[in-house]
Amino acid sequence: MTKRLSDLFNRPFATDPVIAGVTADSRKVTTGWLFAALPGTKVDGRDFAEGAVAKGAAAILAPEGGLEGLGVPVVRSEDARRAYALAAAAFWGKQPAMCVAVTGTNGKTSVAGFCRQIFTKLGHKAASMGTLGVVVSQPGQPDQQLTPPGLTTPDAGDVAEMIARLADMGVTHLALEASSHGVDQRRIDGVKLSAAGFTNFTQDHLDYHGSMEAYRAAKLRLFDTLTPAGAMAVLNADSEAFPDFAAAAVTSGQSVFSVGEEGQGLRLLSRTPTPAGQDLVVEAEGVVHHLKLPLAGAFQASNVLVAAGLCIAAGEDSAKVLKALETLEGAAGRLQRVGRGPKGGEAYVDYAHTPDGLQTVLEALRPHTAGKLIAVFGAGGDRDRGKRPLMGAIGAKLADIAIVTDDNPRSEDPASIRAAILEAAPGAREIGDRRAAIRAAVALMSEGDVLVVAGKGHEQGQIVAGVVHPFDDVAETLQALEGVDA
């Protein structure tokens, strides 16, 4: 497949070469490709422009200024990242008919997966794209994992290529996670959205964004820039940030579909925890629906309502959407039930790695806990240090037993990270070795207790001093449950 340079940027060029591919990775460049020379956080793509031309690049996309005398057309843009996303979308040229995106500090992965499951239940071939990779579902077939878990939002060129591939596979409905990094870096600017959703907004990623204001602006960009006028914004009305997101949506010409206890589109009238999940009573379009949701936690009730709202915004019947909620399965590592303890009790694994995430999961499990609530958690190295004491305080306050352990210390001293957490966690236990911490927690379990191992979720490694050691919280917890007396 080839396109002219003018086709990618929708404007004429004095020299209009044939373009055979689009990338921002100079290692992928081959004859006839457009290389996007983008400045990054670690390397500057402009430093690789000359090498890209030597490898056969037919044109270069770059920010304003510099890069003279390369011998190929240089397309300059005040917003080169956005231009790259739009050029990649123009090159690949296809996408599923119905694309929805969801942003928020927590819940994106679950909402995207729930949307995929609902769309499939209603007869569509659907996909989700995000932290858990790209998953394709169709009625009567096992799920297909196209790409492994990784970044929430891949590079804009990879997004465009994958979305075109999904369209070629017959996928008609796609749900995307829109991380603040991905939105800020213009990775999904080329996707034509039918609707966008918002879950919640709390402290995270300040190491990247620098301030809560910049972090909020990145999230808001999904609505004030990327979602077109006339589309629907599905917003969690129970979030303190709801007014900001509603204002951005209305200003951009979108209609607001609010969900939650304060919602107008889908109103949660009641929620009752049960051993198997929770019973929900939801009002939609004046009709009251009684649902048995097979998922634990108030936050999951919130997530499923955002997902249901996005599916309704995509044109599905509200009654059928709500009925489909009764068949949902939680995302891997998202309040995932692992099994029962040898002396009773239930063990869960969750991705919670922020103060709000940890608080949400502990508060979610408390109503399901007749005995002790046991939490195993830590905090990542080389990341926002301010959240460490916050997580310690939350763990000590909301769990009956808090065990502080290592969670990707990276280049930092693991003991110093644990110390920062423990300083705000009176009574917490310290077990640095994560495997030993999980086994100690399982040994404490008895009938009526609930254990949650928080931090990694679906991740498959423990990062220590630059080395990724294989580690799977679900597998480790399962082994501890099965072999604690061995």
Swiss-Prot record:
Gene Ontology molecular functions: ATP binding; magnesium ion binding; UDP-N-acetylmuramoylalanyl-D-glutamate-2,6-diaminopimelate ligase activity
Residues forming coiled coils: none
Keyword annotations: ATP-binding, Cell cycle, Cell division, Cell shape, Cell wall biogenesis/degradation, Cytoplasm, Ligase, Magnesium, Nucleotide-binding, Peptidoglycan synthesis
PTM entry text: Carboxylation is probably crucial for Mg(2+) binding and, consequently, for the gamma-phosphate positioning of ATP.
Major location (coarse): cytoplasm
InterPro entries per record: Mur-like_cat_sf (IPR036565), Mur_ligase_C (IPR004101), Mur_ligase_C_dom_sf (IPR036615), Mur_ligase_cen (IPR013221), Mur_ligase_N (IPR000713), MurE/MurF_N (IPR035911), UDP-N-AcMur-Glu-dNH2Pim_ligase (IPR005761)
Motif range (Meso-diaminopimelate recognition motif): 407-410
Residues where UDP-N-acetyl-alpha-D-muramoyl-L-alanyl-D-glutamate binds: 26, 152-153, 179, 185, 187
Any one Gene Ontology cellular component term annotated for this protein: cytoplasm
Function summary: Catalyzes the addition of meso-diaminopimelic acid to the nucleotide precursor UDP-N-acetylmuramoyl-L-alanyl-D-glutamate (UMAG) in the biosynthesis of bacterial cell-wall peptidoglycan.
Protein name: UDP-N-acetylmuramoyl-L-alanyl-D-glutamate--2,6-diaminopimelate ligase
